[in-house]
């Protein structure tokens, strides 16, 4: 049916002239349109606008500040800032040293790598990073994931050299991934790890990490490589005859001390440094206790000798031809995504507290470069851990200089103090890890998810259960799969609703949300709440026809004026593809067969452009049947309804003429 059936009746033309006309946007050249689309997709923050109308020298200075953020804050750095950063840097170093050693053991790597990884990467981040509060270092979850994935292919005890080389290679590929995402502005990929996914994943990983520390608490020498809770508990309770009470007492004592200091610092925020110093204090006290009591002779395992000196170069250790390379690549990609998501989220959180912005893409480049450089200097995967960054924030850091101070403190430790860690008991490291992990189990966030969004809670618990009862990889895959499934569900099943008039106004709203709103006799107003694409076109066609069926049945039963007009409110339809246009043609044909008229309200520019190019507007629908607002569309339709009276719908009249 053409537009001739949709011509305005005589007498209504004057009314139409009083209404605003829906205009299609001016056509743009293809290259200009493509450039705009790419810019909006990859550069929503328009980072290069500051370079406009600047001379060459000024552009060079701005470019230097943009690509090397250290030049943004270094020129105005002063002694007052340094005093704050010095205190913060020394404070986080006291936490970084014991945590670094602990997390390296968690990854089945030599403990010294934890110190190496707290020396070089913070220096790189201080130059490239945009966060003032992020403190760089290793993290428990990435360490656990590295150990779990690499151990499936190589035994760290039987072939420690190959295992170490794979860890460096995985770190390299993690850095390449992170830097690439930042350079090509693809950081939105990380957004597929939703808040609910991260809460569940981190909670599950923290639970698994804590349970695995029972090996150190009970002084066990043989333990499962699996991370699921059943395997871990079986390994613990099948070796009760190997439990060492000396180790258990020592571990429980230090765990109680660490948790007590943490609780005290939470209650008294001014004394945050008490909890920050507690891990190093535990290492010192534990080492002294073992040294004077010779506890290592009674089943208390110690770290042993740590190599003295700065990071050795490891570029030649990277593996690019071994059959194990695929394992390194897989480990690097997965751990890189996890570390990236955590680091960016932590940086944004503290930036929000201090009311400044960080550039997510710059952060990705910074993380990537520090891991690439780290892989050449005997470091394994690093990011911005929450615990260390929180201490840095509470210590009053002003700039990334606190990372440089921390790195210098770690350098001093590597050069002169590593022999002092010989007698550090492993059980103290286990207690430090458990204490840190308990803070990652955010049960309050899970409760909040349950109250606000049950589906998000399901995603959270799926990630948690997947990690705890399966593996870290399974939990991550399950959570991401459910998140993507939910996204696809939102896209393929958009909301549609009937709109009614708010009494004594020209406002039209969803009748379910506003029960006081009233439908207009003879007119059905439908709202489409999403772009129309191939994924939802079929659903929308069926749902719109169903709305029409239900309205005609309701009108027939009530004896009201028969349905004459279908107004589609397209305010929320930002775009439409060819499948969506085909759906509109089909809807138009269905409406024609029922002797109804289709009216469009507030179609967006992109939609009007495509409907015009496809000749839907013109061949199927006249321009006069498009209105700028629902109110204008209803006014025009009501005028024609009252001018050309319609008979009430008969109860015996068939209403479904499809």
From Swiss-Prot:
Membrane topology, Extracellular segments: 107-108, 155-163, 207-245, 293-332, 385-398, 447-464
Residue spans, topological domain Cytoplasmic: 1-85, 130-133, 185, 267-271, 354-363, 420-425, 486-658
Localization terms from the record: Membrane
Cystine crosslinks: none
Family matches, as SUPFAM superfamilies: SpoIIaa-like
Membrane topology according to the record: Multi-pass membrane protein
Keywords: Membrane, Stress response, Sulfate transport, Symport, Transmembrane, Transmembrane helix, Transport
Pfam families linked: STAS, Sulfate_transp
A GO term, aspect molecular function: symporter activity
First-listed, main subcellular location of the protein, grouped into a coarse class: membrane
Residue ranges annotated for the STAS domain, each copy included: 513-637
Functional note: H(+)/sulfate cotransporter that may play a role in the regulation of sulfate assimilation.
Name of the protein in question: Sulfate transporter 3.1
Species in which this protein is naturally found: Arabidopsis thaliana
